[in-house]
């Protein structure tokens, strides 16, 4: 039986390339995005769905909503602005929380890969983007929480992605899935793990 992959964030070039790579490997692939998923209604989404073998989370809402806070504008950041940021993140985060718990209940051998950012390993290098790092870290923790005796869960950071390396990055993600990578954040640019929770 063919393996099944779900790719969330299908509109991005990287997601499209990943889906193409999966198809080449004989993996049935379904892409999900805002045009066919209501992130505010998990029950409607999951109704009648078969548990996939692979889940790719590439929603990338964090970049759109994260506040930029530096040593010049920090006094202008209000409680309302901070609340709005988390409020806008909540539907997507809750959706994926429920998805991970649904997987947990299925007890099926699955791999979860979060397309993320390595900024969570060194937030001090880009201090003004600390809220972006915080949001990315939230999703990374959720992905890692899926790890179990039947589920592998890891994140990759496709930093420096461009037209010349997208296919290579997609092939590497597919290989990491094949290798049953677990509890790691791997930066595809430097080809190294920057976080390893198995240590």
Language model segments and positions:
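Rossmann-fold NAD(P)-dependent oxidoreductase module
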Residues: 17, 21, 98, 141, ...
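Conserved mid-core segment of classical short-chain dehydrogenase/reductases
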Residues: 39-43, 58-81
């Amino acid at each position: 039986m063919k393996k099944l992959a779900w790719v969330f964030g299908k509109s991005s070039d990287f997601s499209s390339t990943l889906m193409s790579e999966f198809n080449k490997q004989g993996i049935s692939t379904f892409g999900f995005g805002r045009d066919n998923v209501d992130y505010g209604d998990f029950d409607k989404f999951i109704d009648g769905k078969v548990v996939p073998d692979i889940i790719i989370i590439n929603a990338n809402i964090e970049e759109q909503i994260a506040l930029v806070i530096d040593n010049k504008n920090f006094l202008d950041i209000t409680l309302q602005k901070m609340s709005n940021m988390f409020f806008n993140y909540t539907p997507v985060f809750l959706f994926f929380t429920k998805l991970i718990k649904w997987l947990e209940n299925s007890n099926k051998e699955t791999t979860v890969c979060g397309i993320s950012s390595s900024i969570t390993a060194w937030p001090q290098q880009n201090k003004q983007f600390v809220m972006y790092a915080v949001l990315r870290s939230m999703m990374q923790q959720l992905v890692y929480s899926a790890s179990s005796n039947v589920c592998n869960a890891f994140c990759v950071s496709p930093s420096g992605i461009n037209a010349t390396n997208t296919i290579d990055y997609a092939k590497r993600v597919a290989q990491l899935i094949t290798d049953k990578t677990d509890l790691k954040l791997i930066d595809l640019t430097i080809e190294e793990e920057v976080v390893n929770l198995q240590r």
